[in-house]
Amino acid sequence: MLLLLCVNMSGTQMSAFLRKYLADEDKKIRAQFKESDPNNKLILWMHEKTRITEEDLARPYTEDEVKELCLRTKVKVDMTAWNCLWEAKKRFEAKGRFVNKSERFINRMYMKAVRRKMVQPYPEEFVAQRREIVAAETKKQNISRLDRWQKKKSQNLSAPESSPDAHASSNDAVQSHEDQANTNLSSLSQMNFQVEAMAPPGVSSSDLSGIGDDEDEQQQSGFQDENINRPETEINENSVRCDPINLGRMRTGCINSQANNSFRNTESDPDYYMFGTQLSTLVRPTSTQEPDDQVNCPETEMNESWVRCDQINSESLSIGPSIDSEGTITFQNTESEPIDVTSIA
C-alpha cells in the first residue's frame, strides 16, 4: 500500500493549462535557438528528448516499476515553494529582526506580516497549476529513469551466458574504478583539513600565501652572506679544548679577529702551563714581547675574549711570566713583586 502511494500508477490527462504552458515554453526555446544555426542542433536535440508529451502523461506504471521507483528514487519536498511565510522570513532576516529572538516572537512577527499584508498567501488555483507542472516534469523524469534501467537490464541479459566471469570482471573493474575515485576525493578532503588544522587560530589558508616571498628570500640570502664573510680564523668556542684550570673564573665570550692574529703570531712562543710564582722546568724562558702587528692591552684594561687555556687573556689571570735582561721574573697586569731568579736557584 505504501508503495502504491509513492507514485501514481494510473495515467493522467493533460489539462488545457498544462498544454498551453508547454506550448509557450517550446516557442520560447525555438525562438531563442534557431534551427538554421548548426551550433544549436545539440540543444534542440536535447529539448526534443526532454520535452513533455501527452503520451508520457498517459503512460501507466506497473507494480514493478512503482516498486523500483520507490526504492531507487529519493523523495524531495520543497517546503519553501509558494510559501508566503518563507518570503517574510527572508525579509526579516535581511533586516536583522530575528537576531537573538525567541520562537514566540518570530511567530508573532509572521502573523503581523500577513495581517498587515506585507506578504500575501498564494491563491489556491495558482498553487494547483504549479503543482501540475511539477508532477508532469516528475513523471517525465521517472519515465527516463525506467527506460535507462530497462536498457541496462536488457544489455545484461543479451550478453552470452558462457562468459559469466567476463561480466563479473567488468563489474569488478567498474566497482574498483568508482572506489578509487571515492578514495581520491576523500584523501583530498583530508589533506585540506590537515592544512587548516595546522594553521594558527584565526589564520586561514589564504593568509599563508606570504610564506616564501621575496622578503624571506632576501633575509635568507643575508644569512648566507654573513656566513661567507666570516673570517676563516674564527674558532667555534665549542671546539676549543681547555684544561680544567680555573674554569669557574673564566668568562666565556667570542673570539675576535685580533685575538686570533695574536694566537697565530705567538704559536712559536713558549707555553706556560702553570700560573703563579713557579715555572715549569720544560719551559725555556724567552721574551714575551708581542709582535708589532699585535694589539697591546693597557695595564688597566684587559680583553675579555679568551683563546686557549695556555694563553688566557682575562682580568683574573696573568698572561704569563717573563724574564728581563737582569734575570728578574715579572708578570703582566699583576701587582706581584719581581722575583730574583738567583734567589730561587
Curated annotation (Swiss-Prot):
Gene that encodes it: cav
Q: Does the keyword Electron transport apply?
A: no
Q: Which GO terms describe its molecular function?
A: telomeric DNA binding
Q: Which GO terms describe its cellular component?
A: chromosome, centromeric region; chromosome, telomeric region; nucleus; telomere cap complex
Query: What protein name does the entry list?
Result: Telomere-binding protein cav
Give the species: Drosophila melanogaster (Fruit fly)
Motif range (Su(var)205-binding Pro-containing repeat 1): 231-237
* Complex formation: Component of the HipHop-HOAP telomere capping complex, composed of at least HipHop and cav/HOAP, and may include Su(var)205/HP1; HipHop and cav/HOAP, but not Su(var)205, are interdependent for their protein stability. Interacts with HipHop (via N-terminus). Interacts (via C-terminus) with Su(var)205/HP1 dimer (via hinge and chromoshadow domain) and Orc1; possibly interacts with other components of the origin recognition complex (ORC). Each molecule of cav/HOAP interacts with 2 molecules of Su(var)205/HP1.
**What function is annotated for this protein?**
Part of the HipHop-HOAP complex that recruits the MTV complex to form the terminin telomere-capping complex, which binds to chromosome ends in a sequence-independent manner and prevents telomere fusion. Telomere capping is independent of the origin recognition complex (ORC).
In this chain, the stretch annotated as Disordered covers: 145-180, 200-231
List the residue ranges of the region (Required for binding to Su(var)205): 115-337
